[in-house]
Amino acid sequence: MEDQASAQLLGPVEIRQLAEKLDVTPTKKLGQNFVHDPNTVRMIVSAADLNSDDHVIEVGPGLGSLTLALLDTAQKVTAVEIDPRLAQQLPLTVAERAGQFADRLNLIHKDALTVAPDDIDHPTALVANLPYNVSVPVLLHLLQIFPTIRRVLVMVQAEVADRLAADPGNKVYGVPSVKASFYGNVRRAGSIGKNVFWPAPKIESGLVRIDVFDPEHQPWPVTDDMRKAVFPLIDSAFAQRRKTLRAALSGHFGSGPAAEEALRTAGIDPILRGEKLDIADFVRLARVTAAQEQA
């Protein structure tokens, strides 16, 4: 790979020209903000720690800023784009600016939330400037259906980045924080200013990195069965976050006393609130619940 010329990345002028050619105006409905700074794109790819054998999913490639840099590095890039004009243009942009890597691009014209396991073959990484309005649902959906993903590096709104990487007890700790940590170790990986986007958003963005648990060293089984047992507990615990766990989980367990019994068996104080529990606590509670149901 090293003996091939690098892709020609897009700058502000090229982004505007492409948008004008396609009669594309970034829409709030689709959460579109196009990155037009090559240095930011290079930084994102570097922070993702990609290897030459990686198969990367990119959601919302837009005009191709990040796509071109990913093609430079990865073995294969599957770009998922919902906008028909952008989906039609992306292969043309790649052919023009990174023709030597064109065979590495796989394009799916689809809503990322409807992507199915059979749509993408063994992806190993997710690197994307996620559409702001669906960033968390898309992230969790792809982690759920593609257990082969080992690394995630996504750009999201700063407040979403803070939420995803928050620890128990933090005021922004909540459902996204706990569910993301079911799959791996989550951390903030940098901040992105407004001026690298067109149009410039009103708030800053942040990078979030997830190092997905190694299948041979998972702290709990990262399986569909475990997810289905754990995630409803998380949802119930945070549905009314000011309630104690005993009260918040009473509906899930059928009564307050039943919830308290399960919590105490799991070694969790029933008067705590959900925001004090980490993912390991919820997994332990799910296991207690499963054991009670089998008894």
From Swiss-Prot:
Among SMART domains, the record links this protein to: rADc
Q: Name one GO molecular function term.
A: RNA binding
Question: What does the record give as EC number?
Answer: 2.1.1.182
Matching entries from InterPro entries are given as: KsgA/Erm, rRNA_Ade_diMease-like_C, rRNA_Ade_Mease_Trfase_CS, rRNA_Ade_methylase_Trfase_N, rRNA_adenine_dimethylase, SAM-dependent_MTases_sf
What does the UniProt entry say about where the protein is found? Cytoplasm
Which residues are involved in binding S-adenosyl-L-methionine? 33, 35, 60, 81, 111, 129
Which keywords accompany this UniProt record? Cytoplasm, Methyltransferase, RNA-binding, rRNA processing, S-adenosyl-L-methionine, Transferase
Q: Does the keyword RNA-binding apply?
A: yes
Q: Which GO terms describe its cellular component?
A: cytosol
Name of the top EC class for this enzyme: transferase
Recorded catalytic activity of this chain's protein? adenosine(1518)/adenosine(1519) in 16S rRNA + 4 S-adenosyl-L-methionine = N(6)-dimethyladenosine(1518)/N(6)-dimethyladenosine(1519) in 16S rRNA + 4 S-adenosyl-L-homocysteine + 4 H(+)
Instruction: Look up the signal peptide feature and give its range.
Output: none
Entries under HAMAP family matching the protein:
16SrRNA_methyltr_A
Tell me its family: Belongs to the class I-like SAM-binding methyltransferase superfamily. rRNA adenine N(6)-methyltransferase family. RsmA subfamily.
NCBIfam families linked: ksgA
Q: What's the stated role of this polypeptide? A: Specifically dimethylates two adjacent adenosines (A1518 and A1519) in the loop of a conserved hairpin near the 3'-end of 16S rRNA in the 30S particle. May play a critical role in biogenesis of 30S subunits.
What is the protein's given name? Ribosomal RNA small subunit methyltransferase A
Q: Which organism is it from?
A: Corynebacterium diphtheriae (strain ATCC 700971 / NCTC 13129 / Biotype gravis)
